[in-house]
Amino acid sequence: MKKTICILLVLVSLLTMALASCNDASDVSENDVSVGPQAYVPHLGETTAYQGKVLTILSSHEEHNYSKEAFSATEVTNEPINDASYNRNIKLEENYGFKIETIWEDAGNFMNRVRDDKAAGIDNYDVMVSGLQTLAFLAAEGFFLDLNSLEDSNLQLDQPWWDQPFNEDMSVAGKLYFATGDIVMLDDEYTRCILYNKDLIEDNNLESPAQLVYDHKWTLDALYEMARVASHEGDGDGKMTVTGGDVWGLVQASFESYTLILGSDCPLVSKDEDDIPRLAMMDARNVEAFEKVWEICTDRETTAYTEQWYSWNAPDAYKVCENFQKGQSLFYTITINAVSGKGLREADIRYGILPIPMYDEEQEAYCTTINPYQFHAVSIKENCKDVDFVTFALEALAWTGKEYITPEYYERTLKNKRILDDDDSAEMLDIIFSNRIADVSICYNWDDCIQYYNRIFSAGDGGLASLVESEQDQFNFEMEKTLEFFTKD
């Protein structure tokens, strides 16, 4: 009897193992679509075609935080972003056989370096990474390939590791000469935002501006009303100054007037169905946004911007915005990178971060914009001899950036280390980066249009219509020269 039971138990055990084996085989066939180990960059597959190759990048802004970490980490430092970048580069070499090298050039000399290299026949880099306006100027001189019409390209610019809204903003007549996304970090670092002083919010019994954001009520009117409540003469001399004890509602540089207008979703240009820009400053909504921002920025009892007190390059110009770091301003318009700066690191204030306010509550979404001088993008040289390899390497860098670098930069470092003591800022950052506008006109800077609003605010005359009337012919002339160059073939 015991023998019979043992035999039955063995048979049951064998049957169970067989069924489990069948189930395991079914799981593999249904869920594992790859044969053998998955490629390091899955959509690029496995290949030995690039063994021994080197992707050489000419880049600027070496001194900026997270510039070198994008491509050039050379050793483990126990800094999460650097180490993720270093390990990524090692994995790319192990799996695909290519290396990445970076040549650094000062941002102020970058364009001259590129022009001089071409004139001298120097051809020792494939890709350029620099500020957006620098790349746009070089694109207009014919230095780059159109990414939208590349043959043998491995770029998948419609994928989430590339910034599709940026591509749409930056294309002109269907041509795209630079792209950005998870391949770099200085695009996020030089995205604009507003900081606010939590103590002044509480001292003045004001509603949380973060809650206004959640409620879709963070508007220019809301900012202005709160700024007016908070601002006051504080040192007894009877006048508002930027070097005493007065408290301001808003501090900023004059350029930030345009930031507030762009927050209203009103770039200088709009584009037609053929992807051709046209000057839009006199469109009804743009005019209304300008008038509202004009009211805020010219209220000298509430708002202090740099050019009201100093020239932009004066040694003491920093004193205007320093009021925020001293706890003497409710709001401060700035770029994300400022939270790593010495001033805010050492400031004895509690602050939070906000998107740029909307024009009104009818606006569909919050909009923010960029600093076109340091916001980084990537271009391929027009005489690139190996488009297949260069685009493969850039695509691999972008995908691995999203998978391995961005989580360390955005989630672990920006949200959890650099923005401290704040329950809302992580979600505010998500809102800020969800809808970013890059105005193509100020990147190509036709007729120095980046200064249009600055000129009006610095003059103090509110002359929007007169400026447009005096400048639109030159603006159109310079824009059309660019269009002719881009479409001449």
List the model feature ranges, each with a label.
Residues 56-59, 122-128, 132, 172-194, ...:
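Extracytoplasmic/periplasmic solute-binding protein
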Residues 2-141, 404, 461-489:
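Conserved N-terminal structural module of periplasmic/extracytoplasmic solute-binding proteins
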Residues 152-160, 215, 241-243, 266-288, ...:
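Short, solvent-exposed loop/beta-turn-alpha elements that line the ligand-binding surface or hinge
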Residues 224-227, 259-260, 266-313:
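Glycine-centered hinge/linker elements that transmit conformational signals in sensory
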Residues 37-53, 66-68, 106-108, 133-192, ...:
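Hinge/lid segment of periplasmic solute-binding proteins
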Residues 111-124, 136-141, 224-229, 315-332:
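Short helices/loops that flank or line small-molecule/ion binding pockets
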